[in-house]
Amino acid sequence: MLIKIGNLIYTLVLIPHVLTYLLKRHLFRYEVERWGEVLRLSVSPRNDVRLFLTLVRDIREFRTLFYYRLGPRYFLLRWLAPGMPTCFLHGSERQNVGRGLVIHHGHSMRLGAKHVGEDVEIWHNVTVGKKQSGGELPTIGNRVKICTGAVVLGDIHIGDDATIGACAVVLKDVPANSVVAGNPARIIRHNGQPCNVAL
């Protein structure tokens, strides 16, 4: 009984989030549907508000992305239901992160890039940023997957449909349709064919 009352109170706290979503639905609908597909939740055009409520209630990484997209003016929402405290999305321009970004287990995740393409997936303990103080940031293409513990640093370009393997250290450009792994990272698959090529 107490758990049901607690869930009801928490859902009521999220009413401002739902109202914000309804006002800015055109900005977030794709994001909500994408998270629903990736997490294998029920997705249909008629249940996007219910799906949004599920995501914003249960998934702190989604809340972090939602707040990032809204910007600092919506700090009250952040106060009512905090996002993931160790998941950092950097960039003063909200447009530098393409739509459809999905963050899996956002613990100790730091994303700072010139541009992040659409439908990118990132796992926990990932660092994307500058190689050195004052250095340049990476550019991430579309449909890129950056797996657990990977490090992507410097003025480099990660091509479309690339996968950065777990714990890979990437300091050079990664071609499109490639899988890289290791430290230093090497291409282990390109265009679906196994290989072993230095970056």
Spans of features found by a protein language model:
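Terminal amphipathic alpha-helical/low-complexity segments used for targeting or macromolecular assembly
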Residues: 1-86, 195-199
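Right-handed parallel beta-helix
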Residues: 78-100
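Short, basic/aromatic-enriched C-terminal tail that caps enzymatic domains
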Residues: 183-199
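Left-handed beta-helix
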Residues: 92-94, 98-100, 104-107, 112-113, ...
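Short, flexible segments with low predicted structural confidence
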Residues: 48-54, 68-69, 73-75, 91-93, ...
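Aromatic-residue detector
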Residues: 70, 85-88, 106, 112, ...
